[in-house]
């Protein structure tokens, strides 16, 4: 996608020459738009093509690709401009206005022509060969905060996706996004602050240098372990899962068999083993000592080709355990793992404590007859909902629209059996998001049919049907959903959590932090 914007930042008074000079310093700092942009994608970030001062207005022409899109870029300018000139020149920003904004999506001309006559609220849609131009005019700060632009883009892309007959929609007997159950909290939820905004000032977390990673200090760790214990007691143990220790370094061949490499190749951390040549690494060390920087290019020459990924789904070792084995569906298997981190590369999508690249989960995986697999999936979801209700956490459960294992199957493969509903997703409400009702996904309950059974050559010794399923209890997200509804005041927490946590430990005592 490409974005082209004509807009204005409107100040509280005419912008004088000295003020203009300071603002120009901000405008010429391209790093403002690079935060959250993956390495190698810098040319996709916002770029100011031209600027002009006219009375109270700073007129801007901006372009971008898909990272730090132009409408996000113009908003991102407000804070550094005010930090530079607000107090110094006694000036404020009254509004951000977008006079004209063109979002261009490219697709096959035949697909574009199918959108003829498409009407999208708040904008015009223009079709031109392989281009779909979504044109907005006269948008203010209010429209930007209501995410009108993003919703319109999503709407048009969904119309395109319908033409592809996405396998999830083909397979699912209930429309993805359908809410199948919900629960309203009995108490009044008064806390409405993003928990990420308070976690660091309170000393519960500290930013780690890696993108999408955090250092969780003792109070947060205690809350994590409390939820881990509750999920095991209230959900996992009641169904009778056996704990195992799953590897987290997964060979690429395993991901290929899972078809994960087809579905989400850009969402994993790839691991390159080093060459066992100490003398070559000595050159690397010597250069680093002399230059006082890490010689990345030399390091690349010392690494073998990618051979592994860090576990992005956590259930991968389960299918490998049964690879080309004969099983007896009369003796089904139910394993769970909570032995370490799960890793997904979110790129620019990583934000706050709820969308991270490194997170904790309790992963349940099972295998048996289709009836057994469906019953277990329903139980894993039912007990998660029961736990939320015991804690008076407001939630809803919906039919998922993105079962991870279907990403690698854009068309239905002959002979593969799929369930009527591949995925249910349970979400805890996030009250601090005002524009729309948003929730953080805390439990994902999936049935794979014969997808993995076929991929790994697993058979029943009597040639009966074998299915698999998995449910992930997102420990990190359960904690964030809980804090979003209850806040950080221990006395406001439900008794069940207080008993599990016990006395909250103190935060580290430093002079300069938090």
Curated annotation (Swiss-Prot):
Entry's EC annotation: 6.1.1.11
Cofactors that this protein relies on: Zn(2+)
Binding sites annotated in the UniProt record for Zn(2+): 315, 363, 470
Location within or outside the cell: Cytoplasm
List of residues binding ATP: 344-346, 355-356, 477
Pfam families in alphabetical order: tRNA-synt_2b, tRNA_bind_4
InterPro entries: aa-tRNA-synt_IIb (IPR002314), aa-tRNA-synth_II/BPL/LPL (IPR045864), Ser-tRNA-ligase_2_arc (IPR004503), SerS_tRNA-bd (IPR041293)
Cellular component GO terms held in the UniProt record: cytoplasm
Gene Ontology terms describing biological process: selenocysteine biosynthetic process; seryl-tRNA aminoacylation
SUPFAM superfamilies (UniProt xref): Class II aaRS and biotin synthetases
Pathway(s) this gene product operates in, as recorded in its UniProt entry: Aminoacyl-tRNA biosynthesis; selenocysteinyl-tRNA(Sec) biosynthesis; L-seryl-tRNA(Sec) from L-serine and tRNA(Sec): step 1/1
Cofactor binding note of this UniProt entry: Binds 1 Zn(2+) ion per subunit. This ion is coordinated with 2 cysteines, 1 glutamate and a water molecule that dissociates from the zinc ion to allow the coordination of the amino group of the serine substrate, which is essential for catalysis.
Reaction(s) catalysed by this chain's protein: tRNA(Ser) + L-serine + ATP = L-seryl-tRNA(Ser) + AMP + diphosphate + H(+); tRNA(Sec) + L-serine + ATP = L-seryl-tRNA(Sec) + AMP + diphosphate + H(+)
Record-level Gene Ontology MF annotations: ATP binding; serine-tRNA ligase activity; zinc ion binding
NCBIfam families registered for this protein in UniProt: PRK00960.1, serS_MJ
Known partners and oligomeric status: Homodimer.
UniProt remark on domains: Consists of two distinct domains, a catalytic core and a N-terminal extension that is presumably involved in tRNA binding.
Function: Catalyzes the attachment of serine to tRNA(Ser). Is also able to aminoacylate tRNA(Sec) with serine, to form the misacylated tRNA L-seryl-tRNA(Sec), which will be further converted into selenocysteinyl-tRNA(Sec).
Protein name as annotated: Type-2 serine--tRNA ligase
Natural source organism: Methanococcus maripaludis (strain C6 / ATCC BAA-1332)
């Amino acid at each position: 996608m490409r974005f082209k914007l004509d807009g204005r930042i409107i100040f509280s008074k005419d912008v004088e020459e000295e003020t203009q000079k300071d603002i120009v310093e901000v405008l010429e700092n391209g790093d403002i738009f690079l935060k959250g942009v993956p390495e190698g994608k810098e040319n996709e970030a916002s770029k100011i093509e031209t600027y002009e001062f006219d009375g109270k207005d700073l007129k801007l022409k901006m372009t971008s690709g898909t990272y730090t899109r132009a409408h996000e870029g113009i908003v991102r300018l407000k804070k550094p401009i005010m930090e530079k000139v607000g107090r110094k020149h006694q000036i404020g920003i009254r509004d951000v206005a977008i006079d004209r904004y063109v979002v261009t999506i490219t697709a096959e001309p035949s697909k574009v022509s199918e959108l003829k006559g498409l009407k999208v609220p708040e904008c015009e849609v223009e079709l031109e060969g392989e281009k779909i131009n979504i044109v907005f005019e006269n948008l203010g700060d209010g429209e930007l905060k209501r995410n009108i632009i993003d919703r319109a883009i999503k709407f048009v892309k969904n119309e395109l996706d319908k033409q592809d007959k996405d396998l999830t929609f083909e397979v699912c007997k209930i429309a993805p996004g359908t809410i199948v159950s919900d629960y309203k909290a009995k108490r009044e939820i008064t806390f409405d602050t993003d928990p990420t905004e308070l976690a660091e000032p309170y000393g519960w977390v500290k930013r780690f240098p890696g993108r999408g990673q955090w250092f969780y200090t003792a109070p947060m760790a205690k809350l994590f372990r409390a939820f881990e214990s509750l999920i095991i007691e209230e959900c996992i143990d009641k169904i009778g899962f056996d704990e195992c220790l799953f590897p987290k370094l997964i060979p690429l061949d395993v991901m290929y068999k899972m078809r994960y490499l087809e579905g989400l190749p850009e969402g994993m951390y790839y691991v390159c083993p080093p060459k066992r040549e100490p003398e070559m690494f000595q050159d690397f060390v010597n250069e680093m000592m002399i230059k006082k920087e890490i010689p990345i290019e030399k390091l690349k020459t010392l690494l073998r080709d990618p051979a592994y990924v860090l576990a992005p789904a956590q259930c991968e070792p389960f299918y490998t355990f049964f690879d080309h084995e004969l099983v007896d569906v009369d003796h089904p298997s139910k394993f769970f793992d909570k032995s370490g981190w799960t890793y997904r590369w979110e790129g620019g999508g990583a934000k706050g404590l709820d969308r991270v690249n490194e997170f904790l989960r309790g992963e349940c995986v099972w295998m048996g007859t289709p009836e057994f697999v469906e019953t277990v999936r329903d139980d894993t979801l039912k007990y998660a909902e029961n736990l939320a209700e015991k804690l008076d956490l407001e939630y809803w459960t919906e039919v998922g629209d993105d079962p991870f294992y279907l990403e690698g199957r854009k068309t239905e493969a002959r002979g593969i059996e799929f369930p009527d509903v591949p995925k249910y997703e349970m979400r805890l409400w996030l009250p601090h998001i005002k524009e729309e009702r948003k929730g953080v996904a805390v439990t994902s309950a999936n049935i794979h049919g014969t997808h993995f059974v076929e991929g790994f050559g697993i058979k029943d010794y009597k040639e009966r049907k074998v299915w698999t399923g998995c449910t992930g209890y997102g420990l990190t997200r359960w904690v964030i959903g809980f804090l979003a509804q209850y806040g950080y005041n221990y006395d406001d927490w439900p008794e069940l959590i207080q008993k599990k946590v016990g006395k909250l430990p103190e935060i580290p005592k430093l002079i300069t932090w938090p």
